[in-house]
């Protein structure tokens, strides 16, 4: 019998192959039993609902109430424990949810460039955070709202039977497993190579009751869930209060505008993600270097530099190159640079799509000296706008059936994803075989003009981040 790890890898490869065979915008070739209710859980739900008393509720504390700061180290430790307890089925479920998140993320990324317009700065989007936010809302949804959310999450249903319904608890647990698999890899030497923290803020109008089972269910996705109440009648003031609260609690750069909200909004559902990746063997150059925003404009930016054997591929037909820089054994940073700066939009369309990971098979080892900007990026976006740009159903319109979240009238003002993304040097140890590289054969790769990037984890087949850098000093 093959070892469990080999069997798992083989099964994941099959999942990837099946996904690659799917055509069109919707991908249904998956073992959906991993994420839907089975007959046993349906029977348990039916028994639990028979004569069940009303779910207990509570009114969130005011936003000005004192709150302890988020302990990111403790968060990482919890994720490592989650990863350590995963069995084979858990890992398969995480891989499947990772792929579903990729498909949704690519679709939204491919369409919402119209919302951004021409990006002159830098921006970053998280497919897993988008999927997690929508799965969290699905946890609180009923009837047609739940149907629509299940459809956009990529899981079809044949009828109204329980066994066709997405199991929100399985999905949210799998999303936490996806995070844990990424973080745990860099902890073998007790030094965190990767940091990934997720915090959910549930902001309600004063007096609105939240159901306790809903908030408790969110803890399957992230242990830090912050329900708070505030007045939405002055939207600018409310946005400032939310920003101040989140920055005080997390210390991260955040962004809340409430642009899509109205004075009668009763809910802002916000997901905040902080990622920090340390590039092993890289160092920060002593002086800032030129980064060419276009043919005539440059800015001085901090640059990282490192040398090693990296996976690389140059596409001479479509004029772009890819360099894969490892964070850990299975997690990596993908750097995509057009050979000509004017081709950035074209290359983005070629690489950030559902079958884009196929070109990873073409990568091969190459001795490389890589120079690239040190990245500190912040991106915030309202999923209501992104889904509209992606021409998806009006899932997040203001009037939703969220009766598993609250029995009170819900009017959604904002569904925010806020990303704080950092890449920095880790000079503790050099990259592999640096001193053995034959200098004349070393390829110089310098990212001093617009480029694309992605953070990919093969262990969960998950693209955690997709980004575009036209100017490292400016957030789009």
UniProtKB/Swiss-Prot annotation:
Residues 1-24 form the signal peptide. Keywords: Disulfide bond, Glycoprotein, Secreted, Signal, Vasoactive, Vasoconstrictor. One of its GO terms (molecular function) is serine-type endopeptidase inhibitor activity. Glycans are attached at residues 38, 161, 295, 319. The keyword Transport does not apply. GO terms for biological process: positive regulation of epithelial to mesenchymal transition; regulation of apoptotic process; regulation of systemic arterial blood pressure by renin-angiotensin; response to angiotensin; vasoconstriction. It is found in: Secreted. SMART domains: SERPIN. Belongs to the serpin family. This is Angiotensinogen. It comes from Pan troglodytes.
């Amino acid at each position: 019998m093959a070892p469990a790890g080999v069997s798992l890898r083989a099964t994941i490869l099959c999942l990837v192959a099946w996904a690659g065979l799917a055509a069109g915008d919707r991908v249904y070739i998956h073992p959906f039993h991993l994420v839907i209710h089975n007959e046993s859980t349906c029977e348990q739900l039916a028994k639990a609902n028979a004569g069940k008393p009303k779910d207990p509720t509570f009114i969130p504390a005011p936003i000005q109430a004192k709150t302890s700061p988020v302990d990111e180290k403790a968060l990482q430790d919890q994720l490592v424990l989650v990863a350590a307890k995963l069995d084979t089925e858990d890992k398969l479920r995480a891989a499947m949810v990772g792929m579903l998140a990729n498909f949704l993320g690519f679709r939204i990324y491919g369409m919402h460039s119209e919302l951004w317009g021409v990006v002159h700065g830098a921006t970053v989007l998280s497919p897993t955070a988008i999927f997690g936010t929508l799965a969290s809302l699905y946890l609180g949804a009923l009837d047609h709202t739940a149907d629509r959310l299940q459809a956009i999450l990529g899981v079809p249903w044949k009828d109204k039977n329980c066994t066709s319904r997405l199991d929100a608890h399985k999905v949210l647990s799998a999303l936490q497993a996806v995070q844990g698999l990424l973080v745990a890899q860099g902890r073998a030497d007790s030094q965190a190579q990767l940091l990934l923290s997720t915090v959910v803020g549930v902001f309600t109008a004063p007096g609105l009751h939240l159901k306790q089972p809903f908030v408790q269910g969110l803890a399957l996705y992230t242990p830090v869930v912050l329900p708070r109440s505030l007045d939405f009648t002055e939207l600018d003031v409310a946005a400032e209060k939310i920003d101040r609260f989140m920055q005080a609690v997390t210390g991260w750069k955040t962004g809340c505008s409430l642009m899509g909200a109205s004075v009668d909004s009763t809910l802002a559902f916000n997901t905040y993600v902080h990622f920090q990746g340390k590039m092993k063997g890289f160092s920060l150059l002593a002086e800032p270097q030129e980064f060419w925003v276009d043919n005539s404009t440059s800015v001085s930016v901090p640059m990282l530099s490192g040398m090693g054997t990296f996976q690389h591929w140059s596409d001479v037909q479509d004029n772009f190159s890819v360099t894969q820089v490892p964070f850990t054994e299975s997690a990596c940073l993908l750097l995509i640079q057009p050979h000509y700066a004017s081709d950035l939009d074209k290359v983005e369309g070629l690489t950030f799509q559902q079958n884009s990971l196929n070109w990873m098979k073409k990568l091969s080892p190459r001795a490389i000296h890589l120079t690239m900007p040190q990245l500190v990026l912040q991106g915030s976006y309202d999923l209501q706008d992104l889904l509209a740009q992606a021409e998806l159903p009006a899932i997040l319109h203001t009037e939703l059936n969220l009766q598993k979240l609250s029995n009170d009238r819900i009017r959604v003002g904002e569904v925010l994803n806020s990303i704080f993304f950092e890449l920095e040097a880790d000079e503790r140890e050099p990259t592999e075989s640096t001193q053995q590289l034959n200098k004349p054969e070393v390829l110089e790769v310098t990212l001093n003009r617009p480029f694309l990037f992605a953070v990919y984890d093969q262990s969960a087949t998950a693209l955690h981040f997709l980004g575009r850098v036209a100017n490292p000093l400016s957030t789009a």
